[in-house]
Structures are given as structure tokens and as C-alpha cells.
Swiss-Prot record:
Entry protein name: 3-ketoacyl-CoA thiolase
Source lineage: Bacteria, Pseudomonadati, Pseudomonadota, Gammaproteobacteria, Alteromonadales
GO BP field: fatty acid beta-oxidation; phenylacetate catabolic process
InterPro entries assigned to the protein according to its UniProt record, in alphabetical order: FadA (IPR012805), Thiolase (IPR002155), Thiolase-like (IPR016039), Thiolase-like_sf_Thiolase (IPR050215), Thiolase_acyl_enz_int_AS (IPR020615), Thiolase_AS (IPR020610), Thiolase_C (IPR020617), Thiolase_CS (IPR020613)
EC class (word): transferase
Cross-referenced PANTHER family: 3-KETOACYL-COA THIOLASE FADA, 3-KETOACYL-COA THIOLASE, PEROXISOMAL
Family as reported in the entry's similarity comment: Belongs to the thiolase-like superfamily. Thiolase family.
Function, in words: Catalyzes the final step of fatty acid oxidation in which acetyl-CoA is released and the CoA ester of a fatty acid two carbons shorter is formed.
Catalytic activity: an acyl-CoA + acetyl-CoA = a 3-oxoacyl-CoA + CoA
Keywords noted in UniProt: Acyltransferase, Cytoplasm, Fatty acid metabolism, Lipid degradation, Lipid metabolism, Transferase
Keyword Transferase among UniProt keywords: yes
EC nos: 2.3.1.16
GO molecular function: acetyl-CoA C-acyltransferase activity
Pathway(s) served: Lipid metabolism; fatty acid beta-oxidation
Amino acid sequence: MKQAVIVDCIRTPMGRSKAGVFRNMRAESLSAELMKALLVRNPQLDPNTIEDVIWGCVQQTLEQGFNIARNAALLAGIPKQAGAVTVNRLCGSSMEAIHQAARAIMTGMGDTFIVGGVEHMGHVPMNHGVDFHPGLATNVAKASGMMGLTAEMLGKMHGITRQQQDEFAVRSHQRAHAATVEGRFANEIHAIEGHDANGALIKVMHDEVIRPETSLESLATLRPVFDPANGTVTAGTSSALSDGASAMLVMEEEKAKALGLPIRARIRSMAVAGCDAAIMGYGPVPATQKALQRAGLTMNDIDLIELNEAFAAQSLPCVKDLGLMDLVDEKVNLNGGAIALGHPLGCSGARISTTLINLMESKDATLGLATMCIGLGQGIATVFERA
């Protein structure tokens, strides 16, 4: 079976969805800028050999509709003979794009893919046009479509306190800010145009959504937002609403080597799994267990982990049941996570994978895991191995 590898991986800065730096940039433009950048960064690659562009996006309507993958590819000047498809596994969409490219390579159905994803949550809100079938209420808890309430449920089931959530959120902001100041995001962020508060055109080079001033004292003043009477989940311990895109060049290993392109990571194993929709945030646990089993590994073999932080109340039960509570500061989200950086839905899977690969390189780590929960009760996981 052929080996799928990551040749390159980049992302945009994460922009704040409310009046942020990308308020005048469309989702197709965010995507196209990254596609173009991958080609510029890897001049040995002939664009005419691209088999397919596989792009994750959740809210596929308005500017994100009508197959945004194809729209962005055409904007980027990718040759018209290359295919393009938009995929939707909700929060796991761009990791699903990675998996689809990897499976195609493994089975000989192409050797060069551009993958990634985008979500402009400022232009197309997460709940835009959502209309659940009434019949779902017969066997699915009615609150399952309200992500914050599923986090409340999962946190209560695992005894996660408000204090623990606040501490986890502060850590996310502190680590993301430190990574920014120390230049640890520089290799993964592709600077693109945006607009400052006065409307002037600027080159956006850093994430906008990190709040370095976040403290336990400031978070303690916030009221529960999803269950005001009895809850513990606040806006401060939830992933920020943000706009962004991420992209990867995924190739068959021998093809990449023949072109003299770098092999930044191999895709060692992949998995998806389902769980009860009422505790959708638990999905990373069964997905990770399945991915590790397929790779013949245990959690002890994994050097670094990127776990998408949908909510602190959701992340901590996953960390606990994956046996990582005592290893968080050694292995988990060392540059912060979505609580600080935001969670542009269709972008996040490739974003956390990009951050993971860069961390693996900087730490000289061998094995890394990227995993995330998915709305309505799924999880997705990928094990990467440095060549």
C-alpha cells in the first residue's frame, strides 16, 4: 500500500468573527490565498499534476456554498483539470479532507492533493439555516444540537469543576500568547491581507482572537452562558468564534521524494467514531482509541497531542479518559488551543494538524496525535509520524 505524507501545511491567522480583521474578506479568498501559497512554497510541484482539492466547510451556503472548494481553486489559478470537492463532517471537516486524500493515495487513486478547510463564522453564522428534523427528538436528547449544553452534560458526568475549566482556559490563552511572542507560530501562519479597526488595508500576521490579559480573576466574573441557573460553562471557557482557513499539500511519498520535496510527516493511522450526541465532546476518546489500535500503538507512544478545545468542560473529560491528566503540560496543546485561537468549524481539523506537525518538528518528536470532537456525537483522530 502506498504511503501518504504531508509535504507542507499552513494556515491563516485566526480573525475575530465580530468586526474582525477579515470582516471584508470572503471565505473563498481566505482559502485561495493558502492554495496559492502552497504552490509558491513548493515550486518543484507542477500544478497540472494535482488530482483533487478537498476542502472542509460546515455552513455550505452563501459565500461558502456551491462547492467552495472549486470556487477557491479557480480563484487560486489551480489548473482547471484538477478536481475540487467540499466535504462536511461538521467540526472534523478538514481532518476528513486529510483522510480522504490519504485513502486515495493509499489505494492508488492519485498522488497529489491540496486539502484543508475554511469557515467564516462572521459572514455565515454557525446556526444559519439550521433546521433539525422533529423526529430526532424520539431518540436523541433535544439539547444535542446545542453544543454548550452537551459540554455542560459531559463536564457534570466527569465531575469537572468551574475552577478546573477556568484554569484550562487561562492556560490556553497564556500558551497561545507565548507562542505568538516567541515566534512559534511563524512557520505555520501565512500572512494575508485584512483590515484594521479603521478600515485600512493591512497585512495580518498574527492571530487576533488570543486574549493575553485573561486571568482566573477575570474569568470568575463571567456567568454561565448556556445554563444560567445551574451551569459552569462560560464564554471564557468556550472556543472563540473566529474566521480562518488552513491548508496542506498531501502527496504519495515516493512522488514527493522524486521531486525533492520535504516529507514533514507520514500519516500513520486514521479513525472516526461515534458517541451519544448528548455528549458529543467525548468523541475524541473512541476515535483516538481506534486510531491507536490501527497503528499498533498505545497512548504512551505518543509524544505530542493536539486536542481541539471546543470547551474546557469537554476537553478535560477527554484528557482524563485518555490518561493524560498528569501529562497535559508535557504533551497536550503546548501552544494553546481553540479556546484562545478560535474554532472556525471547517478549518480546525487541518489547523490543529498543522500546529501539531510544526510542534513535532520543533520538539524533535516522532509521533503525534490530532483529535477533535464533532457536533451530534462523533470524533475523528489522526496519528502522524515524522519521517
